[in-house]
């Protein structure tokens, strides 16, 4: 006798939960997105400024999507805690200033007032560089572990600030690799191993890269070449860590190496804030939109005034090895 009222109540509750709601993402005001990195390697260091935008995201291969609008005509200054100051300049390639050699690539020779050669500068970036993409570069700054760096950006009358400490990084003692067999065809391939001493008594966070920093910032590939690491479960000596066991987004896999290939590994120091930033990005990349997934949102930032992105200072330790052919 009571079934009908109960069913009616359920239908009423369900109907009450259905309401058209227009999110209207296109009305969101664009925010500045900052990609900024300083390392202990020789510069110049790159900073990219773009505008955020909203819209549908339907391409699972997000590595090939880069339609962000660059922010130009910004004033960018980086300084440190010992009063070293550098004003960045737009990154533009002027082909007329450079010579070309098929082994050396593009380079230019710097002369003093007497015509003596004092330096040779090599262009290690893509020559098809569009200044509208929002890249800027330092002119003389050199990153040093243990220092704190300050970033100031002025664009369209607004100021954005940040600072980042550069932690020390342990040296990579050596690299190795182990052989794997593909299930589908039985081919042999290799995955890299890393060996290093892990400082004890302090919290350490790392970013492991399987591609040099300049390439990973300017080019996109379908392979996942990054891994973030906390020292929570690391022993005092990291004895052959299998990098390919790291967490990777959907539709991306760690690269497979073959005989004759070179393996590059970079170990970068991270602050806790930088680790949290990358971890948040990774969680977003792995989000499949399911009912039990976290709601999409912007990752944490160390930028002020509502800007997105992150300003990172990292020391880098690097190694490279070649996987020999069996007859070598």
Question: What is each PLM-predicted segment?
Answer:
Residues 18-328:
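A sequence/structural signal for flexible, mid-protein segments enriched
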Residues 2-9:
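Sec-dependent signal peptide recognition
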Residues 11-12, 42:
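Local alpha-helix boundary/kink/capping signal
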Residues 14-16:
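C-terminal motif of bacterial Sec signal peptides marking the signal peptidase cleavage site
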